Amino acid sequence: MLATRRLLSWSLPARVSVRFSGDTTAPKKTSFGSLKDEDRIFTNLYGRHDWRLKGALSRGDWYKTKEILLKGPDWILGEIKTSGLRGRGGAGFPTGLKWSFMNKPSDGRPKYLVVNADEGEPGTCKDREILRHDPHKLVEGCLVGGRAMGARAAYIYIRGEFYNEASNLQVAIREAYEAGLIGKNACGSGYDFDVFVVRGAGAYICGEETALIESIEGKQGKPRLKPPFPADVGVFGCPTTVANVETVAVSPTICRRGGTWFSGFGRERNSGTKLFNISGHVNHPCTVEEEMSVPLKELIEKHAGGVTGGWENLLAVIPGGSSTPLIPKSVCETVLMDFDALVQAQTGLGTAAVIVMDRSTDIVKAIARLIEFYKHESCGQCTPCREGVDWMNKVMARFVRGDARPAEIDSLWEISKQIEGHTICALGDGAAWPVQGLIRHFRPELEERMQRFAQQHQARQAAS
């Protein structure tokens, strides 16, 4: 969420070299997907079991947590780095590296972990399922992650609209306190750690890490200029790491089963399992945990029952939430669902929220609606975003009608490029990329619509 700009610098295709030698090591995997049930981390994703402490314990949560804590920060960070885990909130930054930024000599200030549960990206609902059905995984993850970075407390910033999810999370935290799992001498480890819940107020911009920090501090949710980065000056002026719900929730399982186990899924630099949301024109919309690098076509057909009307009825897919550029059917045939493959396809994994659009979709109107959302959610702090997104919104409204000239398509492209990379946070990028994807793959549709409007206008003038 609002973190996809950094994805580009961490998702360049890995350089491949081939050496002929007597090496007898096992060849690298070439097929991905079909995750086995015993390898799933989120075992109560659909709420079929008890989400409270008793049920969580029966599913393996809080197992040997004390031993993990006693092994110390360096061991935990080593396992996270070995796992190859990358941030699950959109940026894809290596988690072990990010968490290690907090392990500097103490200057007397406390350190904090902030969990970004402000899930507001259109099409994204993976974190909601964790909060609702597996809250103890997140609470335990806060403890393990906090230990790794020497934090004294975690603040879970949860989207204001998530009333039931916040209630379940509060119950899970209370149960953990009562059982001695968090708080003073957490799990009997001698480590003190508190967990607090902060409710948001429905602002999408607060999904950006520094705007989220501002909101926790009681200020307007507007992004800060960086540097200083949160690892130096974060919440209450103290060193802070902001992490996604899914990223934090998987850390205890990685420590229990080993970083090598986790890195065995997916391609190199794109390892592990991942929660995918599949919505739109599919027969069975769902949230599913699957192996990273699973083919997009397999993901849709196996878990979502396929595209309505069959695969040939597919028009386009937004692969990573509303802020990632769409890809047409021709790309969807072969693309893999991971960071590097989707960057090569000129889009991004983002939050892995797959939005499927069949041939009945008015693709121009769909993208125009997304731009209207970003225009509404812009905080107005940066001129390129405030003025540029408003301008794009007005132009896209005319493109929906066809009331424009083909040359304006190039103008819209140029404006989107002027917004991209010229704002404090990535909301401007998130607004620009859907437009760029539309122009890149559906320019003929735009031109045809404009031509049709011009012909109708001429016919009306001739009739009058």
From Swiss-Prot:
Name the positions where [4Fe-4S] cluster binds: 379, 382, 385, 425
N6-acetyllysine modification sites are 81, 104, 375
Cofactor binding annotation: Binds 1 FMN. Binds 1 [4Fe-4S] cluster.
Residues where Omega-N-methylarginine occurs? 257
Listed InterPro entries: ComplexI_51kDa_subunit (IPR050837), NADH-UbQ_OxRdtase_51kDa_CS (IPR001949), NADH-UbQ_OxRdtase_suF (IPR011537), Nuo51_FMN-bd (IPR011538), Nuo51_FMN-bd_sf (IPR037225), Nuop51_4Fe4S-bd (IPR019575), Nuop51_4Fe4S-bd_sf (IPR037207), SLBB_dom (IPR054765)
- Identify the GO cellular component terms for this protein: mitochondrial inner membrane; respiratory chain complex I
Which key words tag this protein in UniProt? Answer: 4Fe-4S, Acetylation, Electron transport, Flavoprotein, FMN, Iron, Iron-sulfur, Membrane, Metal-binding, Methylation, Mitochondrion, Mitochondrion inner membrane, NAD, Oxidoreductase, Respiratory chain, Transit peptide, Translocase, Transport, Ubiquinone
N6-succinyllysine modification sites?
A: 81
Membrane topology term reads: Peripheral membrane protein
GO terms (molecular function) for this protein are: 4 iron, 4 sulfur cluster binding; FMN binding; metal ion binding; NAD binding; NADH dehydrogenase (ubiquinone) activity
- Which class of enzymes does this protein belong to? translocase
UniProt-listed PROSITE patterns: COMPLEX1_51K_1, COMPLEX1_51K_2
Q: Where is the transit peptide?
A: 1-20
Under the heading SUPFAM superfamilies, the entry gives: Nqo1 FMN-binding domain-like, Nqo1 middle domain-like, Nqo1C-terminal domain-like
Q: Which reaction does this enzyme catalyse, per its entry?
A: a ubiquinone + NADH + 5 H(+)(in) = a ubiquinol + NAD(+) + 4 H(+)(out)
User: So what EC number does this one have?
Assistant: 7.1.1.2
Q: Where in the cell is it found?
A: Mitochondrion inner membrane
Cofactor(s) annotated in UniProt:
FMN; [4Fe-4S] cluster
The record's section on SMART domains has: NADH_4Fe-4S
Please give the chief subcellular localization of this protein: mitochondrion
Binding residue positions for NADH: 87-96
Question: What Gene3D superfamilies has UniProt attached to this entry?
Answer: 3.10.20.600, NADH-ubiquinone oxidoreductase 51kDa subunit (3.40.50.11540), NADH-ubiquinone oxidoreductase 51kDa subunit, iron-sulphur binding domain (1.20.1440.230)
Q: Where does FMN bind?
A: 199-247
Family per record: Belongs to the complex I 51 kDa subunit family.
The annotated subunit structure for this chain is: Core subunit of respiratory chain NADH dehydrogenase (Complex I) which is composed of 45 different subunits. This is a component of the flavoprotein-sulfur (FP) fragment of the enzyme. Interacts with RAB5IF.
Q: What is this protein called?
A: NADH dehydrogenase [ubiquinone] flavoprotein 1, mitochondrial
Task: Give the gene that encodes this protein.
Answer: NDUFV1
